[in-house]
UniProtKB/Swiss-Prot annotation:
The lineage of its organism: Bacteria, Pseudomonadati, Pseudomonadota, Gammaproteobacteria, Enterobacterales. One of its GO terms (biological process) is DNA repair. Keywords: DNA damage, DNA repair, DNA replication, Ligase, NAD. The keyword tRNA processing does not apply. It catalyses: NAD(+) + (deoxyribonucleotide)n-3'-hydroxyl + 5'-phospho-(deoxyribonucleotide)m = (deoxyribonucleotide)n+m + AMP + beta-nicotinamide D-nucleotide. GO terms for molecular function: DNA ligase (NAD+) activity. Pfam families: DNA_ligase_aden (PF01653), DNA_ligase_OB (PF03120). Catalyzes the formation of phosphodiester linkages between 5'-phosphoryl and 3'-hydroxyl groups in double-stranded DNA using NAD as a coenzyme and as the energy source for the reaction. The gene is ligB. It is an enzyme of class 6 (ligase). This is DNA ligase B.
Length: 560
């Protein structure tokens, strides 16, 4: 009873999550969006099944198909089936292909395994499914999966694949096998290399009219022997003896979801001879083959890998002005999970880069993780029917603007505050962008150092600043007064690296003001261009005004 209750709760939670992400579209907009995506997926289906080619990555196809199903659940009573079968498959399978139900996560798998025994895990090889029929010890027929009941006659093609045994003996002499035709790989590491569009490549080779030598680049992984030996160990031994060695090599007994998770993680990182997209857990005990029907296999389930890249909906386009005045564009996303990391924002880059990408709210983009786990955009995989792009701010800012607050300077001014509070500058721990915005909104700073004048009472009464932290914040602000002169100059945005600034041995504001361009040019990593920037910086009226203000506050190095 508890198991069924847990399953029911999972279903209800899943349904709630689906409805929670329904787009806020009018019926007309929903109809148009669904129709456009339906047509695109139909075109991809036709390319895949009729011509053996694919213009889209397998993972993108799968995720956009799931997105279409989600939209249809929101606005239409009956979603379409994805992965349409070939229209001209006419050869009956001796035993139907059942397909495999997908488990959402480890918990769901654990529930499924709880009341079952004699379970085995296999890699979910990424290719195209096939039936191999042996009669009197010879390969009699090979049939594509099709709709599970009927498929294409692939006998001629499969007979040219050297990895498929053409003759067998013993219990296999008159047998029906089901498996996956895959692209042979040498040392494929799924974690690093991803899916490489393997499924579409295999389909392309099998659909071509010419009998190319490239068929020998294919292999076969047998995952089912309907009505075969009762013991899994006997099945594996007979298959290996006949030449289907991969099945025995990559089939392991498991008792619980923890063991499956360990094997799944091992194969995710290991060098394998094929591309995979997860694992399949199956019971050794199967019903008689006459009871096999598409979509009705209760003795096996799949636990797929999380995609290396995820399709994410763009919720909004936002613009940020950095401390140097450069405008950057950020896409706010509907949350997706990448390698256990929740991704809700991705940096697009400059305004020009954003315009080249042509991204608008409502579009679907492919996101992955670059080095150090930083989200990046790989592609725009779908653009909405109605696209409205925000207008970027005027490019009026540079490295010498917005030291003093104004309405037009809001974003660059905040960026300067965030920069000066960072560990490498003044080290104002405990305050980030949100805190600086709260302080500026309440106390209306005149310039980037106005926070030095805040009292403990003012900090305590600032909305958005916890009273328990206000005293600590005031203490850090007060300690900042004792920071070395070079730290304050960095806070003012001097266009030098810390190494160059330290090498200058400048210890006072007056000394710095009298330094020449030739002096700066001699510093490590500082050429003539950077030296001119330093001169422009120290002669800027806002910088001079800030220097005088810090002198009045008796900051070290600025005193007259």
């Amino acid at each position: 009873m508890k198991v069924w209750m847990a399953i029911l709760i999972s279903i209800l939670c899943w349904q709630s999550s689906v409805w929670a992400v329904c787009p806020a579209w009018s019926p007309a907009r929903a109809q148009e969006e669904i129709f456009r995506l339906q047509q695109q997926i139909k075109q991809w289906d036709d390319d895949y099944w009729k011509e053996g080619k694919s213009e889209v990555e397998d993972g993108v196809y799968d995720q956009l198909s799931a997105r279409l199903t989600q939209w249809q659940r929101c606005f239409v009573s009956e979603p379409r089936d994805v992965m349409m079968p070939p229209l001209n498959g006419a050869v009956m399978h001796p035993v139907a292909h059942t397909g495999v139900r997908k488990m959402a996560d480890k918990n769901a798998l654990s529930l499924w395994m709880r009341e079952r025994s004699d379970l085995w895990v296999q890699p979910k090889v990424d290719g195209v499914a096939v039936t191999l029929v042996y009669r009197d010890g010879k390969l009699n027929k090979a049939i594509s999966r099709g709709n599970g009941l009927k498929g294409e006659d692939w006998t001629q093609k499969v007979s040219l694949i050297s990895a498929v045994p053409q003759t067998v003996s013993g219990p296999l002499a008159n047998s029906t096998l089901q498996g996956e035709i895959f692209l042979q790989r040498e040392g494929h590491i799924q974690q690093q290399m991803g899916g490489i569009n393997a499924r579409a490549k295999v389909a392309g080779l099998m659909m071509r009219q010419d009998d190319s030598d490239t068929l020998n680049s294919l292999g076969v992984f047998v995952w089912a022997w309907p009505d075969g030996p009762q013991l899994m160990t006997d099945r594996l031994k007979e298959l290996a003896t006949a030449g289907f060695t991969l099945t025995q090599r990559y089939t392991r007994a498991v008792k619980n979801a923890d063991e499956v998770a360990r094997v799944r993680n091992e194969w995710w990182k290991a060098k394998l001879p094929f591309v995979t997209d997860g694992v399949v857990v199956r019971g050794a005990k199967e019903p008689e083959s006459r009871h096999w029907l598409p979509g009705q296999a209760e003795w096996l389930v799949a636990w797929k890998y999380q995609p290396v890249a995820q399709v994410a909906k763009v919720k909004a386009i936002q613009f940020a002005v950095g401390k140097s005045g450069k405008i950057s564009v950020v896409a706010s996303l509907a949350p997706v999970m990448l390698d256990d990391k929740k991704v809700q924002r991705v940096n697009i880059g400059s305004v020009r880069r954003w315009q080249e990408w042509d991204i608008a709210p409502g579009d679907q983009i492919l996101v992955s993780l670059a080095g150090q786990g930083i989200p990046r955009i790989d592609d725009v995989v779908w653009r909405g029917a109605e696209r409205t792009k925000p207008t970027p701010p005027e490019n009026r800012f540079n490295s010498l603007t917005c030291y003093f607050a104004s309405d037009v300077c809001q974003e660059q001014f905040i960026s300067r505050l965030v920069w000066l509070g960072s560990k490498q500058v003044l080290g104002l721990d405990g305050i980030g962008e949100a805190g600086w915005r709260a302080l500026h909104q309440t106390h209306r700073f005149e310039h980037i150092f106005s926070w030095l004048l805040l009292t403990p009472e003012q900090l305590q009464n600032t909305p958005g600043i916890a009273k328990s932290k206000s005293a600590q914040l005031w203490h850090r602000f007060n300690l900042a007064r004792k920071q070395p002169f070079t730290r304050w100059v960095m806070a003012m945005g001097i266009p030098l690296t810390r190494a160059a600034l330290n090498a200058s041995d400048e210890r006072s504001w007056s000394q710095l003001l009298f330094s020449t361009e030739q002096f700066w040019q001699q510093l490590p990593g500082t050429g003539s261009g950077r030296a001119r920037q330093v001169i422009e910086w120290k002669e800027n009226a806002q910088i001079k005004k800030l220097g005088s203000w810090l002198a009045a506050q008796q900051i070290t190095g600025f005193e007259p």
